[in-house]
C-alpha cells in the first residue's frame, strides 16, 4: 500500500499545478492530508503501532513526567515534515505548468486521487481499526467471564513484582543477542517461564500493561475524553484488581517507581486499587538523591532497586504479608539510559555500539542482583518473585532487529515451592499474569477479571483467546465491558456531592461535564473538554445532560450554585438547580415543566489570571485592560478554593479602551484567588494588564 500512497501523492501534486481552477482549495486539502500523515508518522515512531488505543489514552491522560527530551530527534523530523506539508500552498503560485482549460476535470481527478490516497494511507487503516474497537457493541455475552477472586488465601506469602520497562523476552535470544541477559536467563531455568506471551489491544503500554496484569482487563479510556485523569475521582472504580484482593487478605501493598507517578494516571490507579504507599521520582528528590542519578524520565534503576531492596527488608521485618511492586525505567525507548552503577560496563555486540543494548545489559545485572539478594535473605523462602516486562518494546534503536524476531513478553514466577517449568501458551497475554500468580498462591484460584491462569488445564474462556482467534472479531466485547468499569452500569441518576463533584454511576467527575446518553438512556459519552462547544454541536438521538455553574446557562445567577441542563431526544429542556442535584435527578424520567425551542449557547469560564495568588482580607478594585474582548457585556468573577467558592461577581461592559473595573470585597484571606470571565465558546478575551488594588480608607479629619 505504501507504493500506492506515494503514487497518489505524486499525482496529487501534478493535479495541483495542472490547472489554476480552485487551486487554493486543492492546496489546502493536500496540505491538510500531508499534515495528518506527518502527525501519524510521529505517533507511529512513539507507539510502534500507528494511532492505537495507547495513543488515545495518552492524549487524554496526564503527560507530566514524560521524558520528552528523549524524543527530540523525532520531534525535529516532525517539525521538518510540517514545514514540507505546507509546500502545496507555495506550488499554487507556479503557473508555467498550469493549463487554462480543463479545470473541472482536473479538480474531479484531484478529489478522486485524494480519496485513493486516503484509502491507501495508514490513517484509514488506523481509523477503521479504532472504529471497530470503540464502536458500541453488546458486551452482555462476556459479562459472566469477568470473575473476581473471592476465596481466602491459606498461605499468605510475600510477593515482589518487578516490572522491567520494555524488557521483552525476545532479548533472551542468544543467536541475535549473545550474552546480553545471562542473569535473567539463569533465573528463568529455576522459574515458571511463560512463553509466547502476547500484548492484546489495551495492554501494550506501561500503565495498560500494569492494569492488564494486575486486573485482568484491557485498559480503555472512559466513554469520552477525560483529560489528565485528575477530573476523574477514581481510576477504574468498578474493577477489582490484585491489590484490592490482597489488601482484603491482610496484605500491605507498596509501590516504588523511578518515574513520575502522575504520568498516565499510574499513581491514581495504584492508590485506587489497594496500594498503601506509592513512591515515585518525587520521593527520591525529597531524599536528596544527587542530580546525576536522574534522567529525563526519573531516577535511575540502580538507586531504584537499592531502595526496593531496603523496602523489602523493612516490610519483611514488620511481619505483615506484603506486595512490593517496582518498575524499572532505564531501558525506556528509544535509546535507554545508563546509571552510575553500570558506567564502566559495555556490551560487545555484532550489531554495533548501541546505547540501548548497554542499558539492557545493565538492567539484567541489576534485576538479577535484586533477585539474588531476596532469595538469599532469611525472608526469601516466604517470597514469590515475579519478573515481567510491562509491554513489548516500543520503537527504539533496535526496532529493525526486533522486527525480524518472534516477539514475546517476559514473565517469570520464582519461589521456594514453585517447580521450574516452561509453559508454552497458545493464546496467552499479559491479561493472564495476575490469575497465574493467584493460582501459585492458592491452587484453587484460576481467574482474575478476564485473565486465566496459565497453569490451569481446564481454564474457562478468556479474553486472550478471543483476541487471537478470527482476527479478534469478538475482542471488542471485552473492550466495551472494560469501558464500563470507569463509571459502572447504573448511570441514569446524576447528583452533586458535597465536594461539588458530579456523581455518575460509581464515578465522581469534576464539572463542567457533558454526558451523552443513547436512545435507550445508556451512557454513551462523557465530554470533559470543550464542553460548551460539544453541547452546541452534538445532535444526539438520545439525551444530553450538561452540568456546570448556573452562570453558564443564565444571566441572573451570581450565587455560584450548580445547575444541570437536560435536553431529551425531543429537544425538550429543563434546568435543574442545586437542591435538585443534591437529591439526584433521573435522566430517564419525563421532563416536566420543560421549555421548547433552540438550545441555548452556554457559556464557559476563561481564566484571566496567570496563576492563583494569596490575597489578604479587605476591599479591592479589580482593574484590567483587554484589547481583544467581546463586544457585549459578560460576567467576570473572583473565585477561590479550586474555583468552588465565588467571592465576587459582576456583569461588566468594557469601555472603548478595553478597561474593566470591578469591586472585590474579601471578608477573610484567600490562599488561591483567581479571576475568570464567562464567555460563549466563540468569544475570547485577551488580558494585557490586570491589577488588584486595595482600597485605602481615608482618615476622618473632622
From Swiss-Prot:
CDD domains: LTA_synthase (cd16015). GO terms for biological process: glucan biosynthetic process. It is found in: Cell inner membrane. Its EC number is 2.7.8.20. InterPro entries: Alkaline_phosphatase_core_sf, OpgB, OpgB/LTA_synthase_biosynth, Sulfatase_N. The chain crosses the membrane at residues 5-24, 73-95, 102-124. Pathway: Glycan metabolism; osmoregulated periplasmic glucan (OPG) biosynthesis. Pfam families: Sulfatase (PF00884). Transfers a phosphoglycerol residue from phosphatidylglycerol to the membrane-bound nascent glucan backbones. This is Phosphoglycerol transferase I.
